[in-house]
Every structure is written in C-alpha cells, then in structure tokens.
Amino acid sequence: MQKRVRNRLITIIICFCSACLGISIILYNLEKNIVFFLPPSKINEIEQGKELRVGGLVKTDSINKIADDKISFVITDNIKDFEILYQGTLPTLFRKGQGIIAIGQLSNGKFIARQLLAKHDENYRPPQ
C-alpha cells in the first residue's frame, strides 16, 4: 500500500512540474503579444530598429502630406506626443482625433510605420 501511494505522489509531482514548465514556455513565447501596442509615453530611444506597435490619438492639425502617398502626423496619449511617418494608403477611418495603431520601427527619433490600423468603437458601420 505504501509503495502505491508513493508512486501516485511522484506521478502527481511530475505532472505538476510538467504543467508549470509548459505554461512558462507558452508565456515566454507570447511575451511580445501580451500587450498589443505601447502608448507614446512608454516608448524609449533604447528600442531603435525594433519592430513596435504604437497606439494613440491622431493629434489635431498634425497631419502633413509630404508626397502623394507619404504623410507625417503626430499621435498622443495626452502625456507625450510622437511623430510618425507613413507611406501607403491610409485606412478609411484615419482622421484627426481618431485612435490608431502604427506598426513599424523607430529610426533617428522618428517612427517609420509600415502599416496603420484605425481603431473604432462598438458602433462602427462600414461606409456605404
């Protein structure tokens, strides 16, 4: 009887340790995806060249058209402002005061976005 209880206890301990190890590996690999985007106040110069997702509101009167498909604008989280350069087609919902998420890299103090995602509330209706 004693040997049977000891074997069960060892099996339970091994299963528990395996589960902890599996959860640790999953959380480590999902680390960069747990937080979908960073606000401008959390961006540091240390993250140069690293792929980032930055989110905030497009600041009023900050949208500057540089070329046909190249624009510059500022996003804010009401703590810090952050300049973004983007080349490409703008999302339909892009406008001043709108929440956006920019995906790209920090280069020389400016954020070069390769993709823009416009955020919307729960009342979104596609254009007709």
From Swiss-Prot:
Heme binds at H120, Y124. InterPro entries: CcmE (IPR004329), CcmE-like_sf (IPR036127), NA-bd_OB-fold (IPR012340). The keyword Signal does not apply. The chain crosses the membrane at residues 9-29. One of its GO terms (cellular component) is plasma membrane. It is a single-pass type II membrane protein. Residues 30-128 are extracellular. Keywords: Cell membrane, Cytochrome c-type biogenesis, Heme, Iron, Membrane, Metal-binding, Signal-anchor, Transmembrane, Transmembrane helix. Residues 1-8 are cytoplasmic. Heme chaperone required for the biogenesis of c-type cytochromes. Transiently binds heme delivered by CcmC and transfers the heme to apo-cytochromes in a process facilitated by CcmF and CcmH. This is Cytochrome c-type biogenesis protein CcmE. It comes from Rickettsia africae (strain ESF-5). The lineage of its organism: Bacteria, Pseudomonadati, Pseudomonadota, Alphaproteobacteria, Rickettsiales.
